[in-house]
Amino acid sequence: LMAGTSAFAQTSNQIYTPTPENIKARQEFQDNKFGIFLHWGIYSMTAQGEWYMNTHNINRNEYAKLASGFYPSRFDAAEWVSAIKTSGAKYICITSRHHDSFSMFDTKESDFNIVDATPFKRDILKELAEECQKQGIKLHFYYSHLDWFRDDYPEGNTGHGTGRPKGHGNWASYYKFMNKQLTELLTNYGPVGAIWFDGIWDQPTNFNWQLEEQYALIHKLQPSCLIGNNHHRTPYAGEDFQMFERDLPGENKAGFSAGQGISELPLETCETMNGMWGYRIEDQNYKSPKELIHYLVKAAGKNANLLMNIGPQPNGELPATAVEHLKQVGKWMNQYGETIYGTRGGDVVPHTWGVSTRKGDRLFIHILDLQDDALYIPLKAKVKKAIQFISKTPLSFKQEKDGI
């Protein structure tokens, strides 16, 4: 995920036709509406976030020493999945390999991984994948296109102070490395709900990432695996959902979505529970449960999923505040989940007072900030009845030509 901005464009002459399995997976993805993002790696030991290697120009040889001390003794996949399910989330997306190149799984393509380079010696992605299947929640993998560590990744806009030789890069080698790792992830870890790409904004606009071939490989290995790419542009051929970083669709408050239209693909917005993606010890600026719920509702009202991020601690635990917030969001979802799960953006466009979602012939009006005693809802459809969702108490309304 980005700490700065740059542009990237990729064109395609190919026509991507998704398989029936993929179409079904897209619908399930839209129905699920809510996921939890986990940014976890050896950078958590710095307690300064996932960009620490780049922002502090840490030499890669020194940075690699973090691995020898990484021993998350309190990691328990069952506890993680259970806590996340409590929130009402239907899927988990975890960093398999971030920009620092450290792989959080047992890869044969690099010894810079959690099994070979740490005293922990456990494949946490394998444990998490098995637990997700056991508890009935989907697992997605974040995968970085850029790399601050390897010599074969071509020099880009970031990672200049990590000690790699000037003018380094061997694209053919790096591309082969990525595809072999993706093959491992899609072969050894059971059903994968999605691959969540990030980082192609690191290269110039004319850089050829060979996405078509890479996407085709993923769809060949697992046809129902969805592909999304955090390039901050309108989706390219081969992608199955569109993502928005720290923004609701159609907005550009974070500054990443200026060149991004809204496609017909399923939509997802990602946001942090506090301020950072990776664990940062002094970042206690958590959004309140109410703020998180409102963001989830607003995303649903804009026909999008919410992928809400937590940065696990270096000892393997989820932060206590995050766990408590998951519980509070879950309490709300237990009551109002029917108005979120399986819905699409409603017929009433988002307003300052709230949003709407719909399911069949039912329209759910989510009033988040009512300023007056009465509310005018612009709606051309004829309303048969209006009730308060929980109590089922009938609500009085007046049908007019263009609304109620």
What is each stretch, according to the model?
Residues L1-S12:
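Bacterial Sec-dependent N-terminal signal peptides
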Residues Q10-I404:
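Mature catalytic domains of secreted/periplasmic carbohydrate-active enzymes
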